[in-house]
Amino acid sequence: MEELFYVSRAMRYAHIDIARGIAIILVVLGHCCQSTDIALNRVILSFHMPLFFFLSGVFAKSETVKTIMGGVFLKAKKLLIPQVTLSVTIIILKGSIWLSEGKNLSDFDFFACFGFWFLPVLFLCSICYMTVFAIIDLHKAQFKVVTMIIAMSLSVILILNHVDSEIIPVDWLIKSTVAVPFYFGGSFFKERVLKVSNEQRIYDNMLLILLLPIIVIVSQINSPVLMYKNEYGMIPLFFITSVLGIVLVVELSKRLVNMPVLIEFGKLSIAVYVWNFLIVGFSVRVLNRIMLMLGLDNEAILTAATFSISMIILYLLSKWTYNKLPYLYGLK
């Protein structure tokens, strides 16, 4: 996930790693939920993808007309190689199951295994940012405002018209149009996000505490935000939960000074993302069978058990591959 995953190894911001850790854990938890309609998942879905794009935008790289191709190559390496790792792994596993069932390999849908949308959309957002920055000086406030107005307008138009496509690259373009305002927002508010003050005023903390119940209430009023389906519910409610969720996680991360677990997951977030689809899917199937054998039928227990086991496996697998096989994530 671009700079969301790849902050300079020589200079890291602990609270950004914490924010990334919170974000990726929410992704895993959301995938462990048995339905998009349950209250917990509606809350997670209401802001977690905008949060990813915003955090990535914080470390967006500006390029000139002369250096933009080098910037595109670097982003392709850091974002599309993990995408290939994920897709090839899915092809191998699903293809093996397909053949074991006696089916013809020629009928296997290889292209569907490349349909995971987040990393390609983030790649498109980064290209858009580099292109705009090479043409316009986004350091100037007036250009920031105009750029954000245009980006927001395009995003709203697409959502209002329910634009969708079954063609994968076109679908990525549609999603990137909705994601761009959050990505640019991360860049525009970079100084505010990276600044950590030792003075925490009481009323700031009180306002922060109020954000969570507001997000919970609004997310239950709105329909589930399903970005993978290009479904966002009511536009004002989508943007309210997105912005409040971003503020909540960013500001909360500044107050969680010593959280090594979150920092570790933040550093490993690209690896956790790549493997979470497989691990969560495997865990839920195994645990579901065990619960049926025991005569248990409780979604909350299944979700909690799936999440706990998946997090342990994901940490071990992500840690090992990140250190031993960094090329899987475009690191070398």
Pin down the residues of each PLM region:
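Alpha-helical transmembrane segments and their immediate juxtamembrane cytosolic regions
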Residues: 1-332
